[in-house]
Amino acid sequence: MEELQGYLEEDRSRQQQFLYPLLFQEYIYVFAYDHGLNSSIFYEPQNSLGYDNKFSSVLVKRLIIRMYQKNYLIYSVNDIYQNLFVGHNNYFYFNFFSQILSEGFAVIVEIPFSLQLISSLEEKEIPKSHNLQSSHSIFPFLEDKLLHLNYLSDILIPYPVHMEILVQMLQSWIQDVLSLHLLQFLLHEYYNWTSLIIPKKSIYVFSKENKRLFWFLYNLYIYEYEFLLVFPCKQSSFLRLISSGVLLERIHFYVKIEHLGVCRIFCQKTLWIFKDPFIHYIRYQGKSILGSRGTHFLMKKWKYHLVNFWQYYFHFWSQPYRIDIKKLSNYSFYFLGYFSSVQINSSMVRNQMLENSFLMDTLTKKFDTIIPIIPLIRSLSKAQFCTVSGYPISKPIWTDLADCDIINRFGRICRKLSHYHSGSSKKQSLYRMKYILRLSCARTLARKHKSSARSFLQRLSSGLLEEFFTEEEQVIFLIFPKIIYFYLYVSYRERIWYLDIIRINDLVNCLLVTT
């Protein structure tokens, strides 16, 4: 226990005291704007407030001047509560006011964590570390390692229900008491105000408002959880943690751990539960995968250890059903938009020794990835490219655009989806997706020109659309040649993993969260 706390305190000691006065300087918000915070609420249209999609530095400066006035924040909030049923202008004003503060707070607290990430990459001297940021960089690792594992635990990572738990974790990292009080005030007032407008059951911890702040708190929770879970690997001289280090949701990574011992930190003394000689841990967004060569009983020990770990350290209960243990040979798991599985192929080989001949049954394992067609069709239907049964339809909202813009939009979506799903071993779903988008584009153009899709394609020729839908940019990729069958014919298939997929467009992201 003392050893664990020592490692934790040593890691936290690198953090410097945050400067609370920075929050009241308008250049901090300009700094945030210049660095392209695309997830910020200020880049979304504020029609209700009468502002454009770029937040105004002059407006921020005026609000900061008002914040300097004594008790202005408290008076403004009380005034909003008193005039709740008079109109909604006060709500939007308070909403915008709280977003300004939360955005500035998130920018300031991210600075030292970002510096720690840069220094961590420089210390480890990881060659081409930017390639590890691609979500496709996980799949070559899976293809190499899962063939040797027996069981897999599909873990849905829980998150604290109460925000005070996240604030307490942040308190152990920073020394600025004023910033912590401000954060508690923002969370408390935001929760109370939102509960007056909508039912509490509709409140989600990662709401669209204050998204940057909530993502930072969630990243801090994930960092704390994974540091305490896998910290023994840092003691090894030849095995190093390969990850982003901090702000984990922004970089997709994998972790290799061997000879890992897990410590039950809620005990008075160090208690080693087990030592797994071969275990792998992978996480993306709110899900993680724990693979092991051990037995089913060993994986159950991992499961109950994680449940107790969340209960005693983070003080909230996690349901055991959130951790699903499956035998890898009989299980396909959904991960990053793919259904992945380990297939066992059997082949008969005839051996002959002198005058005797006999048949040998040879078993080979293969990592297989396929595209789930149902979530794909559901996402295309939600975006109004086809019906729920997969029948292509026109996109009426795009008929006001120029023909070249319509073709470019459809082609861009098709290329990006094809780009991301290029790692599939079976291309039928990919070809069906291209067919739906191509015919939807033709129907949209035909609707604009008041013609039929068939006559439009005959007049325009299908070669023009095919040229747009097959154009591909030059990017870094990995090619893995696939199976050679021992028959009269040879079938060659390749799986391509691109190392440039850092951010995923909305349609692909919709596929990733669909279950």
UniProtKB/Swiss-Prot annotation:
GO terms for cellular component: chloroplast. It comes from the Eukaryota. GO terms for biological process: mRNA processing; RNA splicing; tRNA processing. InterPro entries: Domain_X, Maturase_MatK, Maturase_MatK_N. It holds the Pfam family MatK_N. Keywords: Chloroplast, mRNA processing, Plastid, RNA-binding, tRNA processing. It is found in: Plastid, Chloroplast. One of its GO terms (molecular function) is RNA binding. Belongs to the intron maturase 2 family. MatK subfamily. Usually encoded in the trnK tRNA gene intron. Probably assists in splicing its own and other chloroplast group II introns. This is Maturase K.
